[in-house]
């Protein structure tokens, strides 16, 4: 009986070898897919560090120079006054809670700006996101500090001309041992390769993710007060929680009457749930493809065992 069994195994060793190889390849692919899905699941359930619900991006355009309403030879002070007036008119709307201006810094932004930070001889390596903003930008996305600071308290830090750094700023730096971002609190640091001016670290933020699935260096952040609103390329607002309904339509209806100021006008209103969906579409499609691939492999394994 044993001889017959060994003889059968010997005769079928080639087919058994191919079966073992097939199972090995399937196992490796399955391990990769399961690992990818697990990591994605873990990432998407980590705190974002911001709240973009009830938030909108307000796109501000400039009149064409050929427009009969275009104000030629406007001074820098006039442009600044137009921007200030537009900001105040948005802020006066009863449904708007906060208005913020910034430069390449809102969540799910396809553009970003990098910087560095130096304290004494310590300088974190790798990419650090630089977010320049007005104080109320903090309130729009409700950033918070590691010591329980509220958005209002963090906004006051920016008003004082101090900066905010993320809790993970010094992570992933083997050359910085035993030091955390909290150790920089209250210290004067150099930012953006400029050693002629120092900024005081006024607070440490809870880690601010670049997007739901992002990890690593793209989540390291420095927030600075923006110099003037002329540097701002982004306008954002937070609408009161119970006043979202018809906000976009109502604001559009008032654009020509109240929001054409000098050469500036509101050109578009985009809710952040739409911005988020657009930014994450490719990643979420890839995750769905991974699920489909895992299901296909499991089906093949099941059919192979029958």
Tell me the role of every PLM-derived stretch.
Residues 9, 90-91, 255:
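Hydrophobic C-terminal alpha-helix "anchor/cap" residues
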Residues 22, 57-60, 100-103, 164-166, ...:
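Short beta-strand segments
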Residues 124-219:
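Hydrophobic secondary-structure segments that place a key small or acidic residue at a functional site
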Residues 167-171, 193-287:
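"Rare, low-scoring activations can occur
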């Amino acid at each position: 009986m044993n001889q017959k069994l060994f003889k059968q195994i010997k005769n079928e060793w080639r087919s058994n070898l191919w079966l073992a190889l097939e199972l090995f390849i399937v196992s490796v692919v399955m391990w990769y897919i399961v690992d990818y899905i697990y990591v994605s699941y873990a990432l998407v359930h980590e705190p974002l560090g911001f709240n973009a619900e009830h938030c909108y991006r307000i796109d501000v355009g400039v009149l064409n120079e050929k427009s009969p309403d275009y104000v030629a030879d406007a001074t820098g002070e006039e442009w600044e006054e137009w921007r200030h007036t537009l900001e105040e008119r948005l802020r006066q709307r009863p449904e708007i809670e906060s208005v913020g201006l910034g430069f390449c810094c809102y969540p799910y932004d396809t553009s970003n700006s990098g910087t560095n930070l130096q304290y004494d001889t310590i300088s974190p390596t790798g990419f650090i996101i630089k977010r320049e903003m007005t104080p109320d930008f903090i309130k729009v996305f409700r950033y918070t500090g590691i010591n329980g600071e509220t958005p209002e308290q963090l906004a006051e830090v920016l008003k004082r001309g101090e900066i905010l750094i993320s809790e993970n700023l010094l992570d992933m730096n083997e050359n910085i041992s035993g030091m955390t971002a909290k150790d920089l609190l209250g210290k004067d640091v150099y930012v953006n390769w400029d050693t002629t001016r120092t900024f005081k670290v006024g607070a440490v933020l809870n880690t601010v993710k670049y997007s739901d699935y992002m990890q690593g260096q793209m989540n390291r952040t420095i927030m600075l007060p923006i110099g003037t609103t002329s540097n701002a390329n982004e306008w954002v607002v937070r609408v009161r929680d119970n006043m979202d309904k018809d906000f976009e339509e109502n604001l559009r209806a008032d654009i020509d009457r109240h929001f054409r100021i000098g050469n500036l006008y509101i050109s578009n209103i985009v809710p952040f749930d739409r911005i988020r969906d657009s930014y994450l579409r490719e990643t979420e499609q890839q995750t769905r493809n991974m699920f489909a691939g895992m299901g296909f492999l499991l089906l093949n394994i099941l059919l192979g065992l029958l």
